[in-house]
């Protein structure tokens, strides 16, 4: 049964469907009780990876239909206008900001709030948010903690990549860094001469170890670790997972080095077909009582974005595990971290997630987007008019399902409204 339903009956465009999944997608993965054996370099029987490679090919074939449109500025602009029109959350961000006194309401804010509301974490009152600017995750956690959990305080630390050039702007669009410098772990290039200088780059092993140390020195215990990192791949979406392997490993390792026992973790990923990504998920399965692959409804269904969620950390690293993983990051290669043949049941669950999120939902939406492009190339206003009534219904429903309440002024984050990206 399709995840989507028809809403415009009759007439020339009766094929139009809403672009909203009926549910928050959440696929559970089994906990692994057997010992974790990390390997610096290993091989995997091709049969284990065959269906993941096939899934990658199928998805990339559909993505490739958009590639010619990216080559010309005019067609690229039209395509993005169409994709923006079928974004069921367009307009919701402003409504949330003004109706609920919310701050930094980006799409990241919506996703994090939805994750918090759906995953039922035991405690989120102390958080380390990595790869964080401009600050949507922190703001959503702050809003959720005070309006839903009613914690007396919310304590947080954060980090983001600080540009290497002193002339480049830090993406501090809302002034969260500028007005809260003591909460941030990374440092300006002006401090390069310091022995423990750290620019927040989680692809550098020494940075990862240092960030985890700084986080735990400033905030203990850490109940929630989040990381929303992603490298801009331009138009090369077919290699999005591959190009982000090292970054996603680094942000995960930072979390596993800093998150307290009993804590929860949320990590951004894209497709989940590469052997290294699969092995990293296998590693996670040894540390959390519950592990999930998720796709919030507010995560645009035309993209490959997924979030891996770990609930209730059961144990910390052994010294040997920490040493092996840091060494792998320092001398990175993308062979699996573990012998994947030992994780057949878990990989079946991961593949079910791949089928559900990418082979069904994403492909259906990409095809829908291309059909809208062909039919509404010069009629974008007409498309918007058709979709507007259902967008309102869906956005109102989303607000009810996710239990939004007004944030009291005294609980708002300190922001510097004048900041537009650059920080002195």
Swiss-Prot record:
Keyword Phosphoprotein: no
Subcellular location(s) per record: Virion
Catalytic residues (UniProt): 268
Domain Adrift-type SAM-dependent 2'-O-MTase: residue ranges: 103-315
Sorted UniProt keywords: Early protein, Methyltransferase, S-adenosyl-L-methionine, Transferase, Virion
EC top class named in words: transferase
Main location: virion
The protein's Enzyme Commission number: 2.1.1.-
Induction: Expressed in the early phase of the viral replicative cycle.
Example of a GO biological process term: methylation
GO cellular component, one term: virion component
UniProt xrefs under SUPFAM superfamilies: S-adenosyl-L-methionine-dependent methyltransferases
Superkingdom of origin: Viruses
GO molecular function, one term: mRNA (nucleoside-2'-O-)-methyltransferase activity
Binding site for S-adenosyl-L-methionine: 135, 228
Descriptive protein name: Probable methyltransferase EP424R
Source organism of this protein record: African swine fever virus (isolate Warthog/Namibia/Wart80/1980) (ASFV)
């Amino acid at each position: 049964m399709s995840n989507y339903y028809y809403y415009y009956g009759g007439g020339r465009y009766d094929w139009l469907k809403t672009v909203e999944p009926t549910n928050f997608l959440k696929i559970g993965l089994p906990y692994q009780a057997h010992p974790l054996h990390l390997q610096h370099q290993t091989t995997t029987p091709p049969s284990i990876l065959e269906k993941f490679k096939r899934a990658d090919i199928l998805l990339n074939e559909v993505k490739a239909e958009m590639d010619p449109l990216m080559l010309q500025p005019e067609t690229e602009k039209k395509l993005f206008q169409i994709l923006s029109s079928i974004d069921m959350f367009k307009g919701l961000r402003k409504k949330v900001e003004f109706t609920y006194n919310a701050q930094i309401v980006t799409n990241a804010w919506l996703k994090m709030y939805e994750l918090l509301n759906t995953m039922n974490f035991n405690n989120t009152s102390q958080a380390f948010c990595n790869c964080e600017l401009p600050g949507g995750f922190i703001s959503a956690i702050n809003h959720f903690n005070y309006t839903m959990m009613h914690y007396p305080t919310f304590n947080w630390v954060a980090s983001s990549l600080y540009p290497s050039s002193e002339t480049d702007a830090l993406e501090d669009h809302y002034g969260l860094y500028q007005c809260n410098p003591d909460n941030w772990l990374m440092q300006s290039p002006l401090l390069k001469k310091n022995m423990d200088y750290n620019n927040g780059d989680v692809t550098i092993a020494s940075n990862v170890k240092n960030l985890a140390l700084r986080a735990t020195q400033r905030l203990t215990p850490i109940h929630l670790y989040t990381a929303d990192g992603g490298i801009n791949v331009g138009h090369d979406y077919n290699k999005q997972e591959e190009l982000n392997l090292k970054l996603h490993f680094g942000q995960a390792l930072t979390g596993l080095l800093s998150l307290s026992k009993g804590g929860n973790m949320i990590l951004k990923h894209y497709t989940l077909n590469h052997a290294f990504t699969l092995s990293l998920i296998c590693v996670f399965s040894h540390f959390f009582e519950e592990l999930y692959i998720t796709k919030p409804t507010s995560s645009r269904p035309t993209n490959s974005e997924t979030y891996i969620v770990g609930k209730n950390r059961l144990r910390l690293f052994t010294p040997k595990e920490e040493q092996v993983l840091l060494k792998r990051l320092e001398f990175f290669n993308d062979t699996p971290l573990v012998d994947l043949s030992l994780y057949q049941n878990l990989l079946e669950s991961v593949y079910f997630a791949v089928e559900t999120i990418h082979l069904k939902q994403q492909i259906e939406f990409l095809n829908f987007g291309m059909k809208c492009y062909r039919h509404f190339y010069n009629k974008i206003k007409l498309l918007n008019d058709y979709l507007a009534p259902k967008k309102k219904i869906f956005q109102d429903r989303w607000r009810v399902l996710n239990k939004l309440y007004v944030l009291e002024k005294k609980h708002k984050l300190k922001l510097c409204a004048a900041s537009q990206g650059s920080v002195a």
